[in-house]
Amino acid sequence: MPSQPENCLFCRLVADGDHVHAADGFVAIRDINPIAETHLLVLPTRHVDTFRDVDAFSDEEAGRMLRFVAETAQAAGLDDYKVLVNVGEGGGQTVFHLHWHVLGGRFDRGKLSHALALETA
């Protein structure tokens, strides 16, 4: 269910969270329920509900977002990693503020399997 910026947990974390990396309209924070040794979330500083709304970004902003995801992994010391985006409730999205999961190191296989499962009707 889409959220409003005034009720959005990630909007609050953008404003007041413990950022591990920040630049050019994006921040990275640690996930509070990590499924890997390194589990970071990359968030745009302005509220966009989901990846479906990627057109809210200009081409230049979208390029900066992708570069920021890569820079976040590099800043965390990751050479090999996964990048995930959950889109919609059926795709596993639980917080409706666009975010990218950057996962590196050892994975908790049980949590990873649960995170990758899609809801089916």
What are these language model-derived features?
Residues M1-A121:
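HIT superfamily nucleotide-processing domains
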